[in-house]
A protein has these predicted regions:
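Short loop/turn motifs at secondary-structure junctions and domain boundaries
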Residues: 48-53
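Conserved GNAT-fold acetyl-CoA-binding loop/helix
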Residues: 26-46
């Protein structure tokens, strides 16, 4: 039996799940995204994600259990896509299915993503969803691949 992957609006209780997922050392190593303390995390989510009407964010559930989130936001004149999944949901095709569902809701094109170069699983996920490599960007000492999804 395959996993049932669905998207739904974020509920307040999901934030605790997302916070715990961000604290996973392997996830932060792969993403090169440092974990935030609880107060900074919750403030970011309540003001910059849930509090911003231009942000589209969905909780990803697997068989009814929150597995992570997919989000899109504006950075200047570019719309970006990002996601975060708990480790138990890695390597099962869940991310690809979730992003595919999300892309049916997020209609802005071009749409950009910039995973850390060393996060090969994330790069492959985006390429499976139709993103193509457009260059590299640097955040401090970390090289990221800029990918774009065209119309």
């Amino acid at each position: 039996m395959s996993d049932e992957v669905r998207l739904r609006d974020v509920e307040e209780t999901d934030l605790e799940v997302f916070f715990e997922q961000e604290q996973d050392p392997e996830a932060t190593r792969r993403s090169q995204f440092p974990p935030r303390d609880r107060e900074r995390f919750m403030t970011h989510w309540t003001t910059k994600v849930l509090g911003d009407p231009t942000v589209l964010v969905q909780t990803v559930t697997v068989n009814g259990t929150p597995a992570g989130n997919v989000v899109s936001w504006w950075e200047e004149d570019r719309r970006f896509l990002g996601y975060w999944f708990g480790r138990p949901f890695w390597g099962r095709g869940i991310g690809t299915r979730a992003v595919t569902l999300f892309l049916q809701r997020e209609q802005t094109r071009p749409l950009y993503a910039d995973p850390y170069t060393g996060n090969t699983g994330s790069v492959r996920l985006l390429e499976r969803c139709g993103f193509t490599r457009a260059g590299t960007v640097w955040y401090g000492d970390n090289e990221h691949i800029l990918l774009v999804l065209h119309a």
